[in-house]
């Protein structure tokens, strides 16, 4: 394993260590022999696993925690007023953002990064599964738990590093991968990009141009925003999607006993490949296809690609299916991280495709006041399509409330448009579920805030079938 260029920094402290982007980086650093400490507001199962590796993690943020640190790595969610960050600045301790550390960790490897508004966690995980299946033992850092291995990161023995690239705060520009995927570009995180879709699009151009001249860029040309930026990218492009304008075109899709079968046509060479996936939804066919394109570019055999797809069991909180039993009645419970209207619609379509005759009840926790404001009408359009909607309060994610933006107002607009929404809390949601279990067959917990805790409580309360 090649050495890193910052071995002199023995003691590394990570502020916000439990975040989905931080935990994987911390794990890799600890396994690479660094002494890692960290702080956060709560201890998650992932943090407990990190502590088992030897990392010291404290609840709360206190200046004394970093007195022995040589280097501080800060999550983008951390305020500039954080007491640890303030102390580090006064003490002239080197401070870097998480993405800069991730980019540094990538340098000794042949690196692959997956960016995009939607699908990047799933796509990154599929790539890791395929490379594992091919015996390449990749190192990877992903923003969700890979269910087949029960973790979001791995320090492998091979020459590849596979990472998820986060565009939400522009930090993916710290990465310089040799192979990159852009799954799609949607109108999300516009609060950071000054409400400008053009600025968001340009950030993806800049990300693509970070590739070396010999790098490969894999694009979904079905996406309108990607088509807009393509002319400004000067790297080798491999395209994928359902349209015939793509180099790799998805054709002849068929659903059989919960498995999606499809063919992939190389429109240049006319080669035709047959694949299948247990993942649900049209959006996941695009995710799978992106991963296949990466594998083909890296000369992985079709046999090993199919092996990796077969071994892939999904990602935590990405259309994660379980069964519960309420008063002797079996119900489907789906947990999904999606919090943008496009993602919610994809989840809803996948649910209806997989459980076509079932009635769906969704519990949705809107994420951020700014997102709810920017996409208010889009949320209304999607959420009116749900048989029964239970709305939790907006999860602020450190934002201040915005006048006129609330779950109550969202509910009113949904119901004005012939939707069926009610306001609930975590506790009253469980009560409603128990009292109305005859009225639905599929229960969906949807969102990126604390709703995963509600899903866990539902599983705890009602028997989970093995």
Located regions from the model:
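Nucleotide phosphate-binding/pyrophosphate-handling subdomain across enzymes
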Residues: 2-13, 21, 25-28, 32, ...
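Phosphate-binding loop of NTP-binding sites
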Residues: 4-5, 14, 21, 28-34, ...
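Conserved N-terminal Rossmann-fold NAD(P)-binding element of oxidoreductases
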Residues: 12-17, 446
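NAD(P)-binding Rossmann-fold cofactor-contacting core
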Residues: 35-49
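Structural beta-sheet core signal
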Residues: 38, 140, 180, 219, ...
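Beta-strand->loop->alpha-helix junctions that form or flank phosphate-binding loops
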Residues: 39-40, 58-61, 96-100, 141-144, ...
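Short acidic low-complexity segments
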Residues: 56-68, 427-433
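C-terminal helical cap/extension that packs against the catalytic core
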Residues: 332, 380-439
């Amino acid at each position: 394993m090649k050495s890193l260029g910052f071995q002199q920094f023995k003691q590394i402290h990570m502020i916000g260590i439990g975040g989905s982007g931080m935990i994987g980086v911390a794990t890799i650093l600890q396994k690479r022999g660094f002494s890692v400490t960290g702080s956060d507001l709560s201890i998650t199962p992932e943090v407990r696993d990190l502590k088992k590796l030897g990392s010291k993690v404290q609840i709360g943020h206190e200046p004394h925690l970093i007195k022995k640190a040589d280097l501080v790595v800060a999550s983008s969610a951390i305020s500039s007023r954080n007491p640890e960050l303030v102390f580090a600045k006064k003490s002239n301790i080197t401070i870097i953002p998480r993405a800069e550390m991730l980019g540094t960790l990538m340098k000794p490897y042949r690196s692959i990064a997956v960016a995009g508004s939607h699908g990047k966690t799933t796509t990154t995980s599929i790539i890791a599964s395929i490379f594992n299946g091919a015996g390449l033992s990749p190192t990877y850092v992903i923003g969700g738990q890979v269910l087949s291995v029960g973790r979001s990161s791995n320090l492998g023995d091979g020459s590849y590093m596979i990472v998820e690239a986060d565009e939400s705060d522009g930090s993916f520009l710290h990465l310089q991968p040799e192979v990159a995927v852009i799954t799609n570009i949607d109108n999300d995180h516009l609060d950071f990009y000054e409400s400008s879709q053009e600025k968001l699009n340009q950030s993806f151009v800049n990300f693509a141009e970070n590739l070396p001249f010999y790098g490969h860029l894999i694009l979904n040309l079905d996406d309108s925003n990607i088509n807009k930026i393509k002319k400004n990218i000067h790297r080798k492009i491999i395209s994928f999607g359902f349209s015939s304008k793509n180099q790799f075109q998805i054709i002849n899709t068929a659903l059989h006993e919960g498995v999606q079968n499809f063919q992939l046509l190389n429109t240049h060479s006319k080669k035709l490949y047959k694949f299948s996936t247990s993942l649900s939804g049209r959006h996941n066919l695009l995710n799978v296809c992106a991963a296949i394109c990466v594998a083909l570019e890296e000369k992985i055999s079709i046999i090993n690609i199919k092996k990796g797809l077969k071994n892939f069991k999904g990602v935590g909180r990405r259309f994660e299916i379980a069964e519960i039993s309420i008063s002797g009645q079996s119900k489907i419970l789906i947990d999904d991280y999606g919090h943008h209207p496009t993602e919610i619609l994809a989840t809803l379509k996948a649910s209806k495709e997989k459980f076509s005759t079932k009635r769906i009840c969704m519990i949705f926790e809107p994420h951020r006041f700014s997102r709810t404001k920017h996409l208010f009408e889009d949320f209304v359009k999607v959420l009116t399509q749900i048989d029964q909607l239970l709305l939790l309060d907006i999860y602020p994610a450190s934002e201040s409330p915005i006048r006129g933006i609330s779950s109550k107002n969202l509910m009113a607009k949904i119901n004005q448009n012939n939707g069926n929404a009610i306001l609930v809390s975590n506790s009253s949601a469980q009560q409603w579920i128990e009292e109305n279990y005859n009225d639905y067959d599929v229960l969906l917990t949807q969102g990126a805030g604390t709703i995963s805790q509600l899903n866990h409580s539902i599983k705890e309360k009602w028997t989970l079938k093995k």
